[in-house]
Amino acid sequence: MSDSRPNISRHDDGTPSKDIANVGKSSLNPFKVLRYGDYKFVWPTEALSLWAMEMEIIVLAIFVLRDTNSPLLVGLIGAVKFAGTLFGPLYGLMVDRFNRKLLQVGVRVFGVALAITLTTLIITDKLELWHAYAIVTAGSMVRMLDLILIQTLTADAVPSHALHGAIGLSRSTLDGARVVGSIVGGTLLELLGLDWAYITITVLYLMATITAIKIDSRPVKTDSETVSIWRGFKEGLHYIKENPLLPGLIFFSFLIEFTAFPLVNGLMAVIGSDLYNQNGTGIGLLAAIASAGALSGAALLGIKQSVLNPGRIMILGSFTWHALMLLLALTPPLWLFTVLLLLWGFSGGITFVAMVVALLRTAPAKTRGRVMGIRSLGIYGLSLGLLFGGWISQEAGPATMIGVLGGIGLSATLIAVIKWPALFRSE
């Protein structure tokens, strides 16, 4: 590594980064961040896993809806995917205390084993509804560990000044996976059946595992190993409490999971089927349109040379995101609904990337795993939002569900701005 002097060119731990001479140059290439360390392996293992997960979400949502005709149970299959969120703080401590590469490989192997189990049940025609719920719940036990690992591995490999590019690429990958996964998953299910859809999902999980093996080993420092679990958890809570930005950022992580993400994490099957009479392919296309918008928003923020005031971007994006939900709730003609859905996804992509950039910039390297682990509890908002949204859809219809969640999001964003004004001024 070169010994460069500008502060912006250094990692959070003070070590200088590479390619400093290029910092001042602009580039529209979102993949330029792959030159940093082993991020060229961190990103592919995330991408392959996300493609598998997004196919799985749409395939299982359609399967449950057809088997039960219950929007509430569709919401439940999405919600149980995040049951393991409760262990987020513990996983954060694990990430700070153990070799992150070995943890990542272990997560991938476990995911492959579950996918093979479900595929076997499908092929042998022994799959029952409770099997799907049980296997998805088991997978949720490591899903949160996977998320924390990816975020910390990214922050380990990519210097602070380029972090927004990595987060933008990561978010674009998620939304790209939703575009491809929704279309491919829905189409495979319609044309070839549940068995071939899950065989494809299993192959993607296997490829993600192989890529994870290429990540550099990250032995932990001695001082991290000697910190007790309880002490480490208290340190994370104390740091969050004393920081003027983190409480508000963690609140927003819960809010958007509760109000916005349920629409593209299972409930799109209900929206497409009940409001616009779409089949599996049509539902997949609607989810893909929302994700294409989010991909564009995340990519736009990711290719910027620098991102100032990510908190302000997050707040303005949240207002726009939830206001568009009120327009979607009016159930306009399908062509206009898709246009609004694209804009909704675009504002969501910008909002999410800004939030994660602010979180990772604010959390120091030595406590990053603990802070992100505690932050992960906010993802319980998605489980609650899926159940709440599924219940509203069942009782009052999908349009009412979209409007209620959008109204809650707008109100909560306004309250957050009043409660944590530092978010709007953060650099």
Locations of regions flagged by a protein language model:
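Hydrophobic alpha-helical segments of secondary membrane carriers
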Residues: T45, V80, L169-A177, F252, ...
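Flexible cytoplasmic inter-helical loops of multi-pass small-molecule transporters
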Residues: G14-S27, I213-H238, E427
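Core transmembrane helices of Major Facilitator Superfamily
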Residues: A138-I150, W344-M355
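Paired intracellular helix-loop junctions of major facilitator superfamily
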Residues: A155-L163, R361-R368
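Transmembrane alpha-helix termini and helix-breaking/packing motifs in multi-pass membrane transporters
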Residues: A61-T68, T119-T124, V180-T200, D274-L275, ...
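Hydrophobic alpha-helical transmembrane segments
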Residues: L129-S140, M144, G165-V220, A288, ...
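Helix-loop boundary and gating motifs at the non-cytosolic
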Residues: G24-A83, H238, E242-A290
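C-terminal transmembrane bundle of multi-pass solute transporters/carriers
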Residues: G75-I77, L90, R97, K101-A113, ...
